[in-house]
């Protein structure tokens, strides 16, 4: 990135972003204006500059202080079913609805101050377990400094509205709130529909579904009421749009089709109001407390998806029925995947061992030495007998026999010691192999 973020010992609730190289003069003016206009409302929803940092007194702006964002994760950890089941297993759809509402509120706060987010993408929104949303990377926002526009000149194609898909660059281009409102609607759709993209689905015409950017540019909203004409339909076993009340369905239709360009997309304030109202119109399924859905529906949509093997929410506290008629493999597997894995086993490293050698017992010679001594004494005795041929050398016969007997006994003791050590080594090796297998 263009800079690095550091903790500040004296201000534990703030961090400092320091640029690798001092930004241009216009960017310095932008940061100075943002720091001077910070207020409680902005700081509640945005990691907004609180003070500029300079290389010296009266020197160039080299960075800024901003609120520290802790205890929060990127928003995709919430709307991705797999990640949510792992990290937030007790969060049902009403939690997601509140997150979506808070996303809209963060946009509304920025817009009320005359600014535009510009580079809307999933990595710029952090969410906590209390559903609170904080926008980061605010120094890239399009800022209106008392009539002077500091443009946002970056963007992500998958969050770029259809009317801007043909732009080769955002350099010198002025964004509007209506452009932001496209990205806002897309984020809300992601959160409420399990991470699905509204322009991704099953192709109905030959050139649809090849590139997401192309489908966005052609307004191929897969969940539209006229999606047959547009060329895409929703993926199989996905959350149906009919889960939402008709007025919220219409808001998505307005946001993702041509009418949103012509007459404007739903504003952030409109989304806050609509989602707050929807939050008051929820009910729980009688089968699972985790199945929360809008009250206008007769049947539970989550149960219907469960029966298709698509598990969005897991009731970890329910009684598991194991009869063949009520067993759903996907549900059991989802519960398995939601469990927290034990920490990785810390294997002992060979370098950490400091073995100490154990010498042979006293008086126990190695077998090779015993054999050499026996051979040498035998050869000497035979030589003397052959040369002298005297009877007195006959006494060497029992001496040689004694040497052989002692050598044999010593050799057996040596073999037993070696066998004992070999067995100890094999046991240690088996224990180690079992540990690492």
Enumerate the predicted regions with their spans.
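C-terminal or otherwise distal, non-catalytic regulatory regions appended to signaling enzyme catalytic cores
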Residues: 287-294, 298-437
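The N-lobe alphaC helix and its flanking beta3-alphaC-beta4 segment of protein kinase-like domains
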Residues: 20-48
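Conserved end of the kinase activation segment
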Residues: 164-178
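Conserved C-lobe activation region of Hanks-type protein kinase-like domains
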Residues: 176-179, 188-249
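Catalytic-loop of the protein kinase fold
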Residues: 107, 111-130
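Activation segment/activation loop of eukaryotic-type protein kinase catalytic domains
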Residues: 123-165
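ATP-binding glycine-rich phosphate-binding loop
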Residues: 1-25, 43-44
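Conserved structural core of kinase catalytic domains
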Residues: 46-99
């Amino acid at each position: 990135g263009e800079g690095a973020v550091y903790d500040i010992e004296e201000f534990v609730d703030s961090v400092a972003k320091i640029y690798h190289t001092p930004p241009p003069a216009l960017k310095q003016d932008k940061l100075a204006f943002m720091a001077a206009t910070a207020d409680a409302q902005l700081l509640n929803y945005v990691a907004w500059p609180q003070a500029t940092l300079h290389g010296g007194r009266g020197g160039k702006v080299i960075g800024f202080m901003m609120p520290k964002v802790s205890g929060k994760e990127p928003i995709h950890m919430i709307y991705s079913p797999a990640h949510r089941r792992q990290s937030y297993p007790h969060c049902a759809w009403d939690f997601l609805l509140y997150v979506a509402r808070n996303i809209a509120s963060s946009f509304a706060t920025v817009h009320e101050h005359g600014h535009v987010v510009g580079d809307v993408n999933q990595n710029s929104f952090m969410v906590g377990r209390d559903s609170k949303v904080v926008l980061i990377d605010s120094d890239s926002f399009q800022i209106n400094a008392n009539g002077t526009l500091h443009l946002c000149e970056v963007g992500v194609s998958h969050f770029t509205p259809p009317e801007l898909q043909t732009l080769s660059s955002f350099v010198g281009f002025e964004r509007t709130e209506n452009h932001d409102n496209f990205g806002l609607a897309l984020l809300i759709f992601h959160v409420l529909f399990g991470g699905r993209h509204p322009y991704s689905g099953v192709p109905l015409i030959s050139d649809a579904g090849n590139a997401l950017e192309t489908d966005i540019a052609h307004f191929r909203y897969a969940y539209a009421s006229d999606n047959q004409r547009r060329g895409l339909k929703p993926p199989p076993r996905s959350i149906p749009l009919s889960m939402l009340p008709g007025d919220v369905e219409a808001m998505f239709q307005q946001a993702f089709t041509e009418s949103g360009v012509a007459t404007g997309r739903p504003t952030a304030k409109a989304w806050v109001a609509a989602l707050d109202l929807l939050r008051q119109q929820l009910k729980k399924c009688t089968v699972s407390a985790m199945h929360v859905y809008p009250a206008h529906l007769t049947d539970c949509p989550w149960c219907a998806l469960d029966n298709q093997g698509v598990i969005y929410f897991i009731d970890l506290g329910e009684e598991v029925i194991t009869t063949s008629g009520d067993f759903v493999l996907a549900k059991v597997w989802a519960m398995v995947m939601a469990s927290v894995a034990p920490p990785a086993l810390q294997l002992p490293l060979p370098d950490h061992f400091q073995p100490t050698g154990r010498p042979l017992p006293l008086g126990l010679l190695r077998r090779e030495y015993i054999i050499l001594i026996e051979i040498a004494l035998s050869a000497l005795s035979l030589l003397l007998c052959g040369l002298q041929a005297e009877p007195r050398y006959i006494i060497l016969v029992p001496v040689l026999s004694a040497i052989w007997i002692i050598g044999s006994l010593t050799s057996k003791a040596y073999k037993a010691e070696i066998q004992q050590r070999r067995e100890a080594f094999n046991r240690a090796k088996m224990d180690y192999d079992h540990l690492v297998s």
